[in-house]
Amino acid sequence: MALYFDHRIKAPDTPSSPSHITWHPTHPFLAVASISPSSGGNVDIYLEQGEPVPDTHIERSFQATSLCWHPTRLILAIGWETGEVIMFNKQDKEQHTVPLPHTTDIAILSWSTSGSCLVSGDKLGVLLLWRLDQRGRVQGTPLLKHEYGKALTHCIFRLPPPGEDLVQLAKAAVSGDEKALDMFNWRKSSFGSFLKTGSQEGLSFFVSLMDGTVHYVDEKGKTAQVASTDSSIQTLFYIERREALVVVTENLLLSLYVVTPEGEAEEVMKVKLSGKTGCRADITLIEGSLLVTAIGEPVLRFWDLERGENYILSLQEKFGFEKGESINCVCFCKAKGLLAAGTNKGRVAMWKKVPSFPNGRGAEGKDMWALQTPTELEGNITQIKWGSRKNLLAVSSTESVSILSEQAMSSHFHQQVAAVQISPSLVNVSFLSTGGTHSLHTDMHISGVFATKDAVAVWNGKQVAIFEPSGSTLRNAGTFLCETSVLAMHEESIYTVEPNRLQVRTWQGTVKQLLLFSETEGSPCFLDVCGTFLVAGTDLAHFKSFDLSRREAKVHCSCKNLAQLVPDVGSITSLRCNANGNKISILLSKVNNSPDSKIYIYDVEMDTVNVFNFTTGQIGQIQTLPFNEPPTNETRSFMDKSLAGYTPVNHFWDQSEPRLFVCEALQEAPGAQPQAVDKQPRVEEGTCHKEEVLILSFFASEEHGFLLHDSFPRPSTYQSLLGMEVPHYYFTKKPGEADKEDRVDSGYYHIPQMVAKRPLRDFVGLEDCDKSTRDAMLNFSFFVTIGDMDEAFKSIKLIKSEAVWENMARMCVKTQRLDVAKVCLGNMGHARGARALREAEQEPELEARVAMLAIQLGMLEEAEQLYKKCKRYDLLNKFYQASDQWQKAVEVAELHDRVHLRTTYYNYAKHLEASADCGQALSYYEKSDTHRFEVPRMLSEDLQSLELYINRMKDKTLWRWWAQYLESQAEMDTALRYYELAQDYFSLVRIHCFQGNIQKAAEIANETGDWAASYHLARQYESQDEVKQAVHFYTRAQAFNNAIRLCKENGLDDQLMNLALLSSPEDMIEAARYYEEKGEQMDRAVMLYHKAGHFSKALELAFTTQQFAALQLIAEDLDEKSDPALLARCSDFCIEHRQFEKAVELLLAAKKYHEALQLCLEQNMTITEDMAEKMTVSKDSKDMSEESRRELLEQIANCCMRQGNYHLATKKYTQAGNKLKAMRALLKSGDTEKIVFFAGVSRQKEIYIMAANYLQSLDWRKEPEIMKSIISFYTKGRALDLLAGFYDACAQVEIDEYQNYDKAHGALTEAYKCLSKAKTKNPLDQETKLAQLQSKMTLVKRFIQARRTYTEDPKESLRQCELLLEEPDLDSTIRVGDVYGFLVEHHVQMEEYQMAYKYLEEMRKRLPSANMSYYVDQRTVDTVHQGLGLLPPSRIMPERVRHNSMEDHKEVYEEVIEEVDNDP
């Protein structure tokens, strides 16, 4: 909490009354104009504590009417009632008078935004614009002059827009232009002087006149009226970011104008503000959107320009304001977020703006403002102004001026004594051990306080006063002068600070010891005492601790430099030590003076620093190492992420327990969280809200380090954390909070005045326990914190207090140890809780079971969070209902537990009904869809309301209910009307029959067809012996058995048949028996038995009565589910009547497969695939053995073969397991694709060979794939002899068709290889074939060689050819014509035509039937004949078909061999 110290200005000796006050915008100088009855008018300048600035007194015999400081320089413009304007230069103590064009009161003085020009205006409407130099002297004549003829009231300069070049440059910088960015950064660039920033003088402004008009003066000096109001203008504002002008008149008429760049104004809003008129109003604008008005009323009135909303803030008596106290003036400080207002009773009221945090919506309206403690002054406050960069507040009353400066409230807690400052010179002292409280009044403005059980010390930086308790009062035990900023006490010693040393003094100020600090260590400025240890921190971020247990203080921890322990350290903010002196906690500020979000805890014994990072929720340890090695760092999480994002502001160690540490942390301002926190996933619903202030306690141990013990939000009625001593936390209370009685149930205890305490979580109910119990509970808390529940249990097992066991049970909720919780509930005697916990064991989620424990212990918030965590929204719904949180229950049901939504609505409706809220109950009964019976019940005592509701709802069920009620009241006519609305035709018919109007009842039954109505009417007709009508309405009612009964009784046989067919099988059988017994119309009996599914009886009766048509119909409906004997009998019947297809179907249904197959053979019936499938017995069938099944399948396949259905035969042979027969059937089909596929999947040698043989019968010469398959199948079938024969045939094709002897030789080579590998039954025959192949290969090779050597040795080539011609078996291998053709071609090329002719003649003799042109080109033959002069031969040529060359057989073979080797 902050206090405001008031410093009354030291005015001149001459009595005077202040008239104007104004702060310099940046420097802490306040200008005050006052009126003196004797001397006239005065202007003085004061410092922040009210001291007058020397040589600044200005005095005239007339009054000052206007004051205005220069925006940056220490130049004050002063306007006087004579029209004189003085420029006072505070720096040089110079006065410069502006020339005198004004002749009356100066009404306005306003500096331009750059401070180079000044506008002055008087009450005659004369307006001047002056240019001044840096010392405040006027430069030449006025830049402009206007005479408006009416008194000027306000002047506001319009901020100049940035030049076009600057706008473009800004856009480029945002886009990432490095040059543009450098031009904006003056540290990196010298381009700044060249920026064309447009007209930066800002010499355009608005002025208002007494007649209510507003004029705009542009840069060129031209003036134009832009707005006009109906009365004098009281306030004028210009909102830069919206380019808008706000005008408020004396009649409180608010007008908002949008201003164009040219200065034209368009009115966009006009509204009449609330408040009394006829008196002066003080109006301020907050952040360009919120208008605040003080009009001498007890309230401040707010108007939100953006939302169009208004609200008020009132003064509250609990803060010390008087009833009827009114507010005269108001002012807002943006830096502090404080709204200050002065009252007619001399009080300064302040409202602090509540910050908006990023975890949700901020406060709105009057909830944005929190009223603070007022500052008490004197007189009627008329003016109030914030100013300077120090944010000082000047307050002017009718008699004096005071300057308020903020100072933090001092408070201290030590040895069960708490001292809290509540005003600048008043301290509230509470002796908590005895309950005594004292108000300590001093004659100084207190800047600090320190309390012990023996004395209380206060000081102000210049003087120290010691007070000790004496009976019911505090008496002064010593006062001495000492310029110390901080102070500490221990027993009878006082510790004060001076540069580079600590002074140990007596209560009277006598120095008895000096504790020195070196120049490098700095001067001590922070002190703390805990137990018998004192810790001191210096302004150079060093710290040292002392042991005070002896007569003189001894160093306990040598001086440490934080800069060596913590990187980027700024300065110390505060530091504390624990009761053992082995832990020192430190708060720091960063280098830029912003608060650090970490707490540093130095371990004296281990020489390590633990770092608590409250922003990220991490704890790290920095360990210093010897020999100047860099420190080591370790980090881990010390608290839940939901507790992250805070900044510590207070920290304390327990006064007696060295392990306990507590701190107070504020939520970081919006936008302050680092990225690491922002990346955390969103917290589960219900836990997303973050408290503004948290109290966190920790346990410290050597083995486990620092562990979070507890955390809770600081109660709203408390101001700040004051300290800690087991079993309580201590807080300062907010001023104005009324003292309240102790609330034992919530665990809060309030001490009168300013101190409050709250027990530690584990000590609720044990606040007055003895030391042994306290130690046991501390150990319990410690072990629970480290997670050792067994040790925690041992530490309290001997304690008999139920409160202790209840605390243990509460801990079990936190640790989720249900086994320990059972023991705790037993020791508490909590039978209900034990039973509930036992019943909850059936829940699968641990959190759900723990939540039940929390409910039994009254920990409802924890139970709620546990249910949310495990997402057991059904149990959460029940919890909300049981705890009377119905809105939450409904919300959960609607969003997450829709299974129980209607139940929730219903239960809520029952609750509302019990609460007598019938209107809401009715609504929720409707939502639960139970209103049709619950609302009539609920409104049964209010029939008029019920009737209105029923008529309004127009619901058939409700109409029916109301009709039944009316019928019970014998109001038949009205009941009929409502039954008709409800479309309850049964009730209509029933009432009409009751009234004897049976004809009307019959009309209704016929029109509607309602079964119940028809049945009731049929009963009526039957009772009246009107059989036909009864049968008719029984039929309409679908009550066929009753209609059949009447037909049988009354001989209505024709109707009986139709009714039986419409009725159930049982009724059909009864009707059939009726016809059978009667012996007539037996066809009807057979049909009815048939329709009823009684086939055996139908067949028997049909055979007996020779009804063949009926038999045929029955046979058509039989299937495999029918009786086999019945099927066989029907099949015989079909055979007799030559219905063979139906007979086969029946035989198959009866599973007589052989008979069905035999019938097909005998009658030459084609076996379809469907019939074949029906004849095929599954492998799992137990009706037939596997051998019989295969035999049947082969018979089916044989039959299919005879009928030419080869594919079906293949399928059945395959199913029978006879793949060879299946292949033969497939070969007969000629389906090459399926043959190849079947051979590939069968994997049998015989099938491979069969497939290959078949493929050889095809034109494999044109299809390389077929040739490849042939080679593959022969290879897989291990038929190498057949493969050799195929290669031999391939070679012959190459020779005969393509004359490709090279490929032919390759094919022969492959044939030889295959044959040589083959294992034949006749080796002699194999040897003969091999010899033949070898001979062929030799001849082909010789011919190939002869042709190849021709180019090198033609003679040798010709000789080889001639030798070949002499071979006896040449014709069987090589075409002789090819050899002769080769020789002829050679001799023709050599022009040896005679030799060529010779070989032609030999060829003719050797091949008499061949055409020569088949071997020798016809042109070659013609050339030979021409060369010899012979006639050309006949040119008749046989037709010759040329085929494409074959694939390389060797490559194909190698590819096939590879496939075979890879085939498993």
Swiss-Prot record:
One of its GO terms (cellular component) is intraciliary transport particle A. The modification Phosphoserine is found at S1445. SUPFAM superfamilies: NHL repeat (SSF101898), TPR-like (SSF48452), WD40 repeat-like (SSF50978). GO terms for biological process: cilium assembly; determination of left/right symmetry; embryonic brain development; embryonic camera-type eye development; embryonic cranial skeleton morphogenesis; embryonic digit morphogenesis; heart development; intraciliary retrograde transport. WD repeats lie at residues 4-48, 51-90, 93-132, 139-188, 221-259, 266-305, 322-361. Keywords: Cell projection, Cilium, Cilium biogenesis/degradation, Cytoplasm, Cytoskeleton, Disease variant, Phosphoprotein, Repeat, TPR repeat, WD repeat. Pfam families: Beta-prop_IFT140_1st (PF23383), Beta-prop_IFT140_2nd (PF23385), TPR_IF140-IFT172 (PF24762), TPR_IF140_C (PF24760). Disulfide bonds: none annotated. It comes from the Eukaryota. InterPro entries: Beta-prop_IFT140_1st, Beta-prop_IFT140_2nd, TPR-like_helical_dom_sf, TPR_IF140/IFT172/WDR19, TPR_IF140_C, WD40/YVTN_repeat-like_dom_sf, WD40_repeat_dom_sf, WD40_rpt. Component of the IFT complex A (IFT-A). IFT-A complex is divided into a core subcomplex composed of IFT122:IFT140:WDR19 which is associated with TULP3 and a peripheral subcomplex composed of IFT43:WDR35:TTC21B. Interacts (via C-terminal region) with IFT122 (via C-terminal region). Interacts with TTC25. Interacts with TTC21A. Component of the IFT complex A (IFT-A), a complex required for retrograde ciliary transport and entry into cilia of G protein-coupled receptors (GPCRs). Plays a pivotal role in proper development and function of ciliated cells through its role in ciliogenesis and/or cilium maintenance. Required for the development and maintenance of the outer segments of rod and cone photoreceptor cells. Plays a role in maintenance and the delivery of opsin to the outer segment of photoreceptor cells. It is linked to Defects in Ift140 are the cause of cauliflower (cauli) phenotype, a mouse model for human asphyxiating thoracic dystrophy (Jeune syndrome). Embryos die at 13.5 dpc and exhibit exencephaly, anophthalmia, severely disorganized ribs with extensive exostoses, vertebral and palatal defects, agenesis/hypoplasia of the craniofacial skeleton, and polydactyly of the hindlimbs. Cilia morphology in limb buds is severely disrupted with a broader and bulbous appearance. This is Intraflagellar transport protein 140 homolog. It comes from Mus musculus (Mouse).
